[in-house]
Amino acid sequence: MCDVDLKTCQKSSKFKKKDIVELGKQCGVNPYLSNGKEKSRTVICTEIVASYNPPPGSSQGDDSEHESISQVNNIPNRNEKFLPKSKYPTYTQVLNMEKRQLKALAKKLGLEYKKQTEQQLQGAINLKIKTLEGLNSSTRSRSPSVRSRCRSPSPRAPSVRSRLPSTRSRCRSPSPRAPSTRSRSPSVRSRCRSPSPRAPSVRSRSPSRQSVRQSSESADEAEQVALETMKTAHLRMLATTLGASTVTGMKKKDLIDYIKSRRKSPSPSPVPPSTRCDPTTTAPPMEDLFKKKVDELKTMAKNAGFVRWNGKTLSKMNKSDLVDFLLNGMNRPSPSLPQSRSRTRSPPPPPRSRSPSVGSPSVRDGGAGRRRLPELTRAQLTAMKVVDLKAMATELGLTRYRGMNRTQMRKGDVINFIIETQKKQKTPSPSPTPPSPVPSVVGSRRPKSPLPYKSRDFVALADDDSEPGVEVQKKMGKSGEREPKSVPNVRIIPSEIPAPTEGSLRSRLSTQQQTQQSVVYEDPNESIKPEESVRAPKLSVVDPQLSRKTLKPLPSLVVTDQPSKQPELPKYKGRTPYTDLEQLAQSKGYTVKQVSGDGNCLFRSVCKSIRALRGEKFTHRQLRQMVVDYLRENPEFLQVYLEYVARQRDNSLPSTEQYLSEMSKCGTWGDLICLKTLSEILKVQFNLLILNTKQFQMVSSQDDYPDVIPLGYIDNYHYTSLVPIGLDSKGGAASSTTTGLKQLDGPRPPITLIPESQVPAVAATISTQQPPSIVAPPISVGGSQLVPSIVPQPQMPKPDFKPVKPLSNLNELLDLMDRVKPQVYNDISQLEKARQSIKVSLGL
């Protein structure tokens, strides 16, 4: 029955699927897969025919290990996860395959082949084949049968066919006269070879020892392939978990060798018997463990008999610790790093406390009473959890750091504390010396970075000029937190700051204003700050060769989608911004009205300018609330600017409600959106005098608004109020210093339209019974010419205009209009009064 033809077995209608399965069982072929499902009809028939109908002249039979790759790829798709043992390609054949062949083979083996490189496919396929071969070898090793093969080269040596229920022998003779006899057994297959026809020798192999050796070799090769396919970052993490102190400079090959050495030579530290598992249990590959979730790893650890590992319970184990336990803690003791070699006796170890699992057991520091932990890089500390970092910082003696306690510190603050503490432990402590007084900055010492215009850190300089040095004091709030930032950090080069002169604006400042501390950005670089005033530091000669390049100020306005976050500020290269702006404004015909830099400078400056030019009174809180209310009622007005900011910065669209909630807070910086909104609400145009470009820039929602409000703008961080020269805070007209107009010493003379000598006599009829009436004199008309009876002769002086250079751009024209507009408005009002007087005198 088993000598059936392949074509007959596959296509004969008398054989159904269940008949083929029964036939396979009778012929010694396993018709089931490893997962319990039945093999396909074609595969069962192929195994039956290949086992019992070998082709004539074949010397290797069905166990040939040199099958072509095309035969491997031609396996039917109905049974993709099954490959006969003899169809596995070798390691060299897999390396020589093309990528499409590797994908087809990976698909048949049930592996992931999409978006995989050629090297990843080769490693995964070799690992899968080694695993399948190890399973097949372990299955065969558990069988108590002996497989031997007998061959009789002599044509006269007859081979006897015997049917035994438990043994299976196969003899082949190349002679056509020697009938082949087969012994059939569903579980045992033996082959014997006899070099002589009369003395057949049976060579038996011990499958148990061979299978154990083969499984161990396949496990080592599978581990090597898995380590080669892993990323370098994962290898470094695994090496750190296994006890490596420094993995920064190690290459991938060195990492693999270290991991394999740790796997082969575990630490001899004792392990509780409850954590030991069955020695026959093999740990899963490292790559598969890292792909699993933490919950799955915890379940595997529970099944493996987990109690404690490296002093941690299961709830405190992270992913790397779980992988370390599953790789090393199931069959062997817990690995630990070797302690630092020292000739002196180490004190007894302190009681175990919650500490990170990275690094070796800590050693107590000399007389400091703290435990010295191994030095870790910033990358290793970043990979740790915040709880472990805080535990390590507590062991290093953390009480307070930069005004923050342990609960207020974030992950970055804890990492900075650990790194600074490690540096202090690394450097030897110097001998105690008496404290020296803090000297002042003298000589030719150059500061390492440009001076900040205003800074959170102010400097108290001593009077001793022996040695250069500074003493920095932190300005903290009542609760220990840093105060909010309101004024940006504008750096000033000290070599360009002149000493204050008598009569200047700087010398007129009060002592309280000069010594007032300001709250701004904290400069991370080391710098030298002014002594008494943020505007006039007293510094001596500096070295120009040590000057640093500074950033240019931004000439344009800043639009921000997060008002609470101050923009990055440029470095100011001028002398003092307020003095320079005052000089620039005076050259343009304006007076600077300073406002406080508390974050409300935009709204305060608009209040002052509106009050001076139009007489309307507002507070900065009212203007801020008006802006927020208008944007809430008109969200489309705000959405356009937020979309523009999102496109320019290539980030997600900010929330309108988030912007409004931040802008409604007092002290939040105003931006271009607020200026546009105020222009729409107040129906005015804002003319910004920018200190950096020394030019005016018009900002308005519409160009047809008649009123223009000038403002001063200092390098993207501060607004001031500008008032035309001659106007006080109440909006009244005063003496004018407009360029191009002659200034009058006294008050403007009254306009006289009709001289007193030529005033005509007007006869009025006035009685008590009738209302008074004004009768104009008759006008004599002679010929075609009309002679007026009243000849006005005004006595206004002619204005003396100086020669004006031709205008070059629109900004100069707007500047000229701003200077002439107050004078013209005054003249127009006087002309209107004269017109009314003429009408009254003529009786109209």
Swiss-Prot record:
Domain OTU as annotated: residue spans: 590-725
Annotated active site = D598, C601, H718
Q: Where is the composition biased (Basic and acidic residues)?
A: 472-485, 526-535
Q: Spell out the coiled coil positions from the record.
A: none
The annotated region (Disordered) lies at 136-223, 261-287, 326-377, 422-541
Question: Which reaction equation describes what this protein catalyses?
Answer: Thiol-dependent hydrolysis of ester, thioester, amide, peptide and isopeptide bonds formed by the C-terminal Gly of ubiquitin (a 76-residue protein attached to proteins as an intracellular targeting signal)
Q: Which Gene3D superfamilies match?
A: 3.90.70.80
Query: Keywords assigned by UniProt?
Result: Hydrolase, Protease, Thiol protease, Ubl conjugation pathway
* Cited InterPro entries: OTU_dom, Papain-like_cys_pep_sf, Peptidase_C85-like, Rho-like_N
Q: What EC number(s) does this enzyme carry?
A: 3.4.19.12
> One GO biological process from the UniProt record?
proteolysis
* Top EC class, one word: hydrolase
Q: Bias regions of kind Pro residues — which residues?
A: 429-438
Gene Ontology MF, one: cysteine-type deubiquitinase activity
UniProt lists compositionally biased (Low complexity) regions at: 137-216, 332-341, 354-364, 504-518
Function of this protein?
Answer: Hydrolase that can remove conjugated ubiquitin from proteins and may therefore play an important regulatory role at the level of protein turnover by preventing degradation.
> Which CDD domains does the UniProt entry name for this protein?
OTU_232R-like
Protein's UniProt name: Putative ubiquitin thioesterase 232R
